[in-house]
């Protein structure tokens, strides 16, 4: 039988290993507008905040720093920094850790819930800013109010038709 000719070798370097220069990691600075948004949104503030590639995460325990292991996501994603403002994320409003502590929320009836899940805006006055949308006590997502209507921020991939 004529094989493919694969070859494996393990090399060992003898001698003194030169110490590599380590880059000093600067701690990521959370933008002021992001901390203000969190302070305005939650009754109880998260203990730890972390920024990675413009995304802000929150946890009650310290974040793990494992340099050799790629960690996809730690904690709850609060939002993403876009053009000097924080664009909130769905995770923030539906998480068990932070969803129950939202300062501004609206309890929907069945008809409003169906409209919300379909991606429609709701004609509800009196709410300004981001509002958590609840149905029978369950957090489904969020909307942004301008005082006259709640504009739906439910993710397009989750909407029903």
Predicted features along the sequence, with ranges:
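Polybasic, low-complexity RNA-engagement segments
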Residues: 14-161
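Class I S-adenosyl-L-methionine
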Residues: 1-5
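Conserved beta strand-loop-helix elements of the APE1-like EEP
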Residues: 6-14
């Amino acid at each position: 039988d004529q094989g493919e000719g694969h070859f494996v070798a393990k090399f060992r370097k003898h001698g003194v290993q030169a110490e590599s220069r380590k880059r000093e990691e600067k701690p990521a600075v959370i933008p002021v507008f992001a901390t203000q948004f969190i302070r305005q949104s939650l009754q109880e503030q998260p203990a730890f905040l972390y920024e990675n590639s413009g995304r802000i995460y929150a946890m009650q325990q310290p974040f793990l720093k494992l340099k050799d292991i790629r960690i996809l996501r730690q904690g709850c994603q609060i939002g993403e920094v876009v053009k000097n403002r924080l664009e909130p994320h769905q995770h923030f409003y539906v998480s068990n850790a932070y969803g129950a502590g939202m300062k501004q929320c609206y309890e929907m009836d069945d008809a409003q819930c169906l409209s919300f899940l379909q991606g429609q805006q709701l004609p509800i006055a009196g709410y300004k800013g981001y509002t958590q949308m609840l149905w029978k006590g369950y957090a489904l997502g969020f909307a942004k109010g301008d005082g006259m209507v709640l504009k739906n921020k439910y993710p397009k991939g989750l909407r029903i038709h």
